[in-house]
Amino acid sequence: MKKVNTEAVVRNSFKKLRCRIRALVRNTSSNLVHDFRTEIKKLKAILNLFSTELKDPEDLKLPRRLKDIYRAAGSIRELQLQLSQTKRYKEYSALLIEVQTDREEHFRRIAQKKTIKKTRQRIMERLPGQLHQHTITLFRENKLKEIETIRALPQPSDDQMHTIRKNLKDIIYVQKIGDEKSIENPAVKEMKQATKELGKLNDLRTSIKYLRPVWINEIGYVERRKLVRLRTVRTRRKDALKKRIISEYPGFQFTRVSEE
């Protein structure tokens, strides 16, 4: 295993994060929101990995303020996805756009440079001096174990399916830290494909959330009926996709990453 400079890894992650936030404050396009959230997920996975080298793993938890910024961006992303699929419903789209505008203003208020700088300083002071190969192996195996536990359930919930996706993503994010060549491992490629399918499942779940009564009750009768039908269709599609994912990836054995 190559020697890992933990400070350099985290410093580079925060550098990218600052650039993402700076761009997002100016323009909350769907691509920029996605890039920012991906960078946060990578940082969180890295910190979780490094924390296993410490006596108190809580020292490297993602700070609350950074979580708040991440969630604010996520709430914008959800509406962007929903709007891209429901443009023909005029009243509904107008409602979502109004909410999205409020959420974008909230994001700009909390996405302050000082928050990122203070967060980085706090984390840099608590990083472990070195990272061992067995730490990466243990991190990965714990993620896989949780996946297998969920997969063994008769009917995994939507939340549990999302946990599988997050675990697979975490494995992918940290795998390159241990060995850059491992990112080409066929198992990792299969994991990426699985996360795409699980991402589609989560997108359907999110869409259904924004079609619940609390979001459409104030819409006119004709359009509301169409939205109710759309919710039914997407619920059926979600359930069918979940079954297909489970059947196509029995046991999620493909997630076993080579130690070579």
Indicate where each model-derived feature is located.
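Function-determining surface determinants
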Residues: 1-260
